[in-house]
Amino acid sequence: DVVWHGNTTMSVASTIRDAYALGLGADHIVNNWAMDENLPKLAGKASEGVMGAAMCAFYGEDVPLMPKVVEYGKKYNPGVPREKRTVRAIQAWSNALALWEALKRADKAGGLGGENILKKGFETMKGFDLGLGGAPLTYTATDHRISGQVPIYVIKEGKIMLVEAIDLKARWPQKWANEWLGW
């Protein structure tokens, strides 16, 4: 049996703990918003084997821009110890860096108006790597989906470990092209 959790860490941890205590014996798959460093802390042994996707590296993982993120974390939030920092910081950095890049491109192309940021900023990105463990960004006028590369993680012995990155576009090209459309 498999249980899919489409919620945030605290409610998922509670559900997983309860399922474990009741001996329900199901495997658990969680969404991006539940797969973070707090899940094994909150769910304890019940989180063993939980799998989920993440859209970027976890705090401290070996990716090119992580030293800069860690440096700025120490500089601007010195009271927060490293073990309290989470993937959410990396998500925020990723979002800010993507917007910054789009703004630079739009400005260079003639203006920072809303439509220009989309058309001359985001939609000019092709294989743009943020350096934070996420898939390279490619946006077009007709496709604003992620690149299709999704890292899958598992919790083992209280640690979040990368299993593999799945390339959805390569693995299921027909579904990607014809069914999994969206913005």
Language-model segments: residues:
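Extracytosolic ligand-binding ectodomains
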Residues: 1-183
